[in-house]
């Protein structure tokens, strides 16, 4: 498995079997990703999108076979305009926008995506990639298990700064339930996790750690450090440095809205 970093730091994963390859995520849709990936493998490439956000999905139409959970179609379409991508790049490169030509940007094509289903298995020849639903960050968020390698690619589903505060995110309570479900479903099948931001590898305990962070939020014991993002006020559950490394030495974190802790907004 090969990790690929994008212009703005997101991490994609190329999984190669004996016959086929899977690319997990495609970042911003600028700079001809397919041309680069084809220097790494000569095998037919299938794309699995972990979710529909601008920094993960916009490069997908360069490829012929793309799978995404349709619950994220509206997110993908909303983030497809060129100005959305340029704004994201500028925000993540200190206000500087590289001198890209207009034809360096991939045109959106969600109508060509295939449905990515919970439990779907891709046979690559000697290796398999399994997609499993883990809604929370978005309603269509998926994780990818490579069982032969005992690796679980978590993407943005569960990491050191899981965003749970925008209109497309689930409540902390619902997210916790989904974490528990995936933890039980995949118990014993992976020994390490891979992320799509900041660091590549994390421990097999990442899901459990984030469940515990959710527990602290739901019991009023979180640190609740104010966090501002694109006009939205949210809170970082556990104190962390500028690289989202927890100050207590723990692993995993969430950034959430006080209005989205409970299902239906009602505390238990």
Task: Go through each PLM region and give its residues.
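Active-site-proximal loop/helix segments of hydrolase catalytic cores
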Residues: 135-167, 172-173, 180-183
């Amino acid at each position: 498995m090969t990790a690929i970093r994008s212009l703005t730091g997101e991490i994609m994963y190329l999984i190669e079997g004996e016959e086929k390859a899977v690319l997990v995520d495609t970042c911003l849709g600028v700079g001809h990703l397919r041309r680069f990936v084809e220097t790494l493998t000569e095998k037919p490439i299938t794309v699995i999108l972990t979710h529909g956000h601008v920094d993960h999905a916009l490069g997908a139409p360069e490829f012929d076979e793309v799978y995404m959970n349709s619950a994220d179609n509206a997110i993908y379409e909303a983030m497809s305009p060129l100005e959305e991508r340029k704004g994201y790049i500028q925000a993540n490169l200190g206000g500087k926008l590289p001198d890209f030509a207009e034809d360096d940007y991939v045109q959106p094509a969600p109508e060509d995506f295939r449905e990515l289903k919970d439990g779907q298995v891709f046979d690559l020849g000697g290796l398999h990639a399994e997609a499993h639903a883990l809604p929370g960050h978005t309603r269509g968020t998926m994780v990818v298990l490579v069982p032969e390698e005992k690796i679980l690619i978590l993407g943005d589903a569960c990491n050191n700064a899981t965003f749970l505060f925008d209109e497309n995110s689930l409540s902390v309570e619902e997210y916790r339930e989904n974490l528990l479900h995936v933890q039980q479903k995949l118990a014993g099948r992976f020994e390490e996790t891979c992320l799509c931001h900041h660091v590549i590898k994390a421990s097999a305990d990442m899901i459990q750690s984030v469940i515990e962070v959710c527990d602290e939020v739901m019991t009023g014991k979180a640190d609740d450090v104010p966090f501002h993002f694109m006009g939205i006020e949210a809170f970082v559950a556990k104190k962390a440095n500028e690289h989202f490394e927890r100050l207590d030495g723990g692993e995993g974190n969430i950034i959430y809205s006080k209005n989205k802790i409970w299902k239906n907004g009602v505390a238990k």
